[in-house]
C-alpha cells in the first residue's frame, strides 16, 4: 500500500464521517427537531469537476496498469463525492434554542435582523455575518416564520 492509497483512505474516511454526522448525528444534537427544511443546492459545477477529475484518475490508473487497490479506492472516493454532492439534500434544522445551518449551530439570540428578498431568499443578519437561506419550496418560508415567532 502506497502513500497515495493511505491519502485516499483518509479522504474516504473524512467524507464518510461527514456523511454520517450530517445524516444521523446532527439531527439528534441540541434537543428534538422542530422543523427541517430542505434547501437549494449550490452550484453543481464544483461537484462535476471533482467527480470528473476522479474519473480521469481512474482511467489513467487502469490504462497504466496501476494497483487494483488504488482503482477501488478512487472508485469509492468518486461514489462518496457523488453522494455528498448529488444525493444528500442540504437542510436547515430548527431546534428549541437555535438551528443548524451549513452544519453550524446558531442560537436564536444571535439573530439581529431578518429580511426576505424579492427572489425568496431569507436573509438573517448575525453579529458578524449574513446568512442567505435559499429554501427549495417557497412555502417553507412561512413555516420558518411561524416557528421563529412561536419560539421567540
From Swiss-Prot:
TM stretches of this protein: 6-26, 45-65, 67-87
How does this protein lie in the membrane? Answer: Multi-pass membrane protein
GO CC terms in record: plasma membrane
What are the subcellular locations of this protein?
A: Cell inner membrane
InterPro entries noted in UniProt: DUF986 (IPR009328)
Q: Which Pfam families match?
A: DUF986
The protein's predominant localisation is: membrane
Cytoplasmic compartment ranges equal: 27-44, 88-152
State which ranges are Periplasmic (membrane side).
1-5, 66
Q: Which cysteines are joined by disulfide bonds?
A: none
Keyword Membrane assigned to the entry: answer is yes
- Could you list this entry's UniProt keywords, alphabetically sorted: Cell inner membrane, Cell membrane, Membrane, Transmembrane, Transmembrane helix
Source domain of life is: Bacteria
NCBIfam families cross-referenced by the UniProt entry: PRK02913.1
Q: Which family does it belong to?
A: Belongs to the UPF0266 family.
Write down what this protein is called: UPF0266 membrane protein YobD
Native source species: Escherichia coli (strain K12)
